[in-house]
Amino acid sequence: MMRRVSLLFWLLVATLGFTACVRTTEQPVSTPPTQPTATLAPLSPAFLPTSTLPVPTPRAQPERMGTFFFYWYHCPERACDASELTAIPPGWLTPLPDDPDPRDGLAYSSINYDWFEGELRDLVDVGFDLILPVSWGDHPHPWFRQDRLDLLVQANGILEKPLPIGMFLDTTAQQAMYNDFVADGYRFGPTIPRMPLSDARSGYFFYDLHIKGFFERIPREMWATEQGRPIIVTYTALCCDELYRAGELWRAVKEAFRADFGVEPWLILEETWFTPEALAPGEGLQPLELVADGRYHWGTALHGPQTATLRNFSVTSVGPGFDNRSIVGITDPRLQPREAPPGGGPPSNGAFFRASLAAVPPATDLLLIETWNEWPESTGIARASHQGVDGQPLPDDFYMDLLRRWRRGG
């Protein structure tokens, strides 16, 4: 049941000048989707890689490196269709190697403690400085709800040096939550109505139902921070309409966070939030650039490396390639082969990722790898059974090792 009074609801009512009543009746039960829809890259590439591979040169390393970590899997029962994958990770079809405890399963699953621990150890070994677990709030699927973060925290806590944890706020969830709220069911996608930011309740779906619960489950000593402020990275603005109010929305979110946690978050928004109307919203409304702390590009696993800078804070994102053609029901199949050099030329193992890493500016404050383990879109660099250009299996840690050696300057 929705709470009668939400801090952020009344903040938004006050700041946006709207009045509305929060519905307090029990929400209708909707039929959840079979699995979360994969987060698709924006349709229009903003970057085309150069026609030749950059030549790596000695360089200063980015200040920090993080990655998007997906825990929406529950093999072998759910969200585990091998026919949608181009590379199979350990634990997907067969038990995880060296999993000592069958009581919580032996598979690639967010209910399996040993899966979390194994992933975290690999992340540390590669050289990541922080991780960004993808979050949809309390998704209808029990294996992808906020409480699954408890196992992540538990596994992280046994590491010699726990990985700092930030939030990857998948805004697809806001579209789904809003449609569920207005009695249309938990639905999302390009043909589904978007959430209007002029609705004073919009902040409730971002903060109270999502962001707040995430950070309540991550101990403060594990927060990934920038200048002492916990990091939130958002997905695209495809969830929402009326983006001229985006600055007001995110200002209210930051104020509500500060009221609950005593500090404002470091907010890194995806580039699609920065529309002309969001940047120049009109008299009396907050321009988005004055509210956000950083900006970045999603879709670099498909389109190539991108860097965005806001007030001297630079974020670069890169990925190894992209292939969503096997996803059931996909209406926009796209491909960036991993072995294809940007602009053409003889294929080689990991060519797209190598070129992307070589293009990272040395002054980057935060490098984001897209992704650690988003398998249906084939953007993961974690352990998996990739094939080489000769048709032979690559080592399951091929992409991990490629990044590890690059990070260490090799």
Regions found by a protein language model. Give the residues of each.
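A general secondary-structure boundary signal
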Residues: 19-20, 409
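Ser/Thr-rich, Proline-interspersed low-complexity disordered segments
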Residues: 11, 15, 21-59
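Residue-level detector of intrinsically disordered/flexible regions characterized by low predicted structural confidence
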Residues: 5, 25-28, 374
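Bacterial N-terminal signal peptides that target proteins for export
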Residues: 1-8
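Glycan-processing catalytic domains of CAZymes
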Residues: 47-410
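Short amphipathic alpha-helical "recognition" segments used for binding
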Residues: 7, 30-31, 378
